């Protein structure tokens, strides 16, 4: 999942806040403190940023695509 571009409920743009949010949390602030510092007041926007997880690191470990054995390909023509 990519970082959210907009709030799923109200549509407020949030994509520009994602890098700073991750940076603040990595520096030791709680997610709530980071959201307060970024000025995210609406609970729907806070939920969208707080619950977003990037899975790209996990997905990159797996190969994309399906291996089809040659004998199965002959079966289709």
UniProtKB/Swiss-Prot annotation:
Which cofactor names does the annotation list? Answer: Zn(2+)
Give the binding site residues for Zn(2+).
Answer: 7, 10, 44-45
The EC number(s) this enzyme carries = 2.7.7.6
- Enzyme kind, highest EC tier: transferase
One of the GO BP terms on file: DNA-templated transcription
Keyword list (alphabetical) reads: Cytoplasm, DNA-directed RNA polymerase, Metal-binding, Nucleotidyltransferase, Transcription, Transferase, Zinc
Where it sits in the cell: the answer is:
Cytoplasm
Q: Which GO terms of the molecular function aspect are on file?
A: DNA binding; DNA-directed RNA polymerase activity; zinc ion binding
Which intervals of the chain form a coiled coil? Answer: none
Q: How does it assemble?
A: Part of the RNA polymerase complex.
Function in brief? DNA-dependent RNA polymerase (RNAP) catalyzes the transcription of DNA into RNA using the four ribonucleoside triphosphates as substrates.
- Could you identify this protein by its name? DNA-directed RNA polymerase subunit Rpo10
Q: Which organism is it from?
A: Aeropyrum pernix (strain ATCC 700893 / DSM 11879 / JCM 9820 / NBRC 100138 / K1)
